[in-house]
C-alpha cells in the first residue's frame, strides 16, 4: 500500500503489519516509509506490535486515501482510474517523478536491505515457530529464543 498512488479501503478491511509477530522484518521499505508517515512512536506500535488497525486509522495516517463501503471500492477505483486516464500523461509522469525523487534512492536501498534480512528471517527458528503455531492454531512460544 505504501507505494500506491491511490488506496481505497473497504470499511470491512482488517489491516495490520504483523512482520515481527511472524518472526520477520518489514519489507518493501516499510521500515523507512511507515515512520515517515506516522512518526517513530506510532510506527513502532504498528511495526513492532503488529496490532490490527481500522481502515479509518489508515486514512488518518496517510496510508489510505478513503474508506468506502465494501461493495463500492472497485467501482470507485474504476472511476478514479478513468479520471486519471484523462490527464496529460507527460505531466502525470513528471509529477510522479518529482514526488518520489528525493527518496527514490533511499527507498531502493532500504528495500534491498530489508529483502536480505527478510529472507534470513524467513528461515529463522522464530519464523518457523510462528508459522507452525499459525497452522496448528495456537499461540507461538518465543520464550526459548532470547
Predicted regions mapped to residue ranges:
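Hydrophobic alpha-helical segments typical of transmembrane helices
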Residues: 29-33, 42, 91-94, 114-117, ...
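K/E-rich alpha-helical interaction surfaces of small helical-bundle regulatory domains
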Residues: 9-10, 48, 128-140
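C-terminal long alpha-helix characteristic of the crotonase
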Residues: 8-13, 55, 59, 64-120, ...
Amino acid at each position: 500500500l505504501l507505494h500506491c498512488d491511490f488506496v481505497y479501503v473497504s470499511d470491512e478491511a482488517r489491516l495490520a503489519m504483523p512482520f515481527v509477530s511472524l518472526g520477520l522484518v518489514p519489507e518493501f521499505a516499510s521500515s523507512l516509509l511507515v515512520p515517515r508517515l506516522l512518526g517513530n512512536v506510532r510506527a513502532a506500535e504498528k511495526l513492532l506490535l503488529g496490532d490490527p488497525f481500522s481502515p479509518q486509522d489508515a486514512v488518518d495516517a496517510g496510508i489510505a486515501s478513503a474508506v468506502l463501503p465494501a461493495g463500492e471500492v472497485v467501482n470507485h477505483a474504476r472511476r478514479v482510474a478513468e479520471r486519471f486516464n484523462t490527464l496529460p500523461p507527460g505531466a502525470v509522469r513528471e509529477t510522479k517523478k518529482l514526488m518520489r525523487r528525493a527518496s527514490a534512492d533511499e527507498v531502493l536501498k532500504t528495500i534491498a536491505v530489508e529483502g536480505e534480512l527478510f529472507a534470513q528471517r524467513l528461515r529463522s527458528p522464530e519464523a518457523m515457530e510462528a508459522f507452525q503455531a499459525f497452522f496448528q492454531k495456537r499461540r507461538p512460544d518465543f520464550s526459548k529464543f532470547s
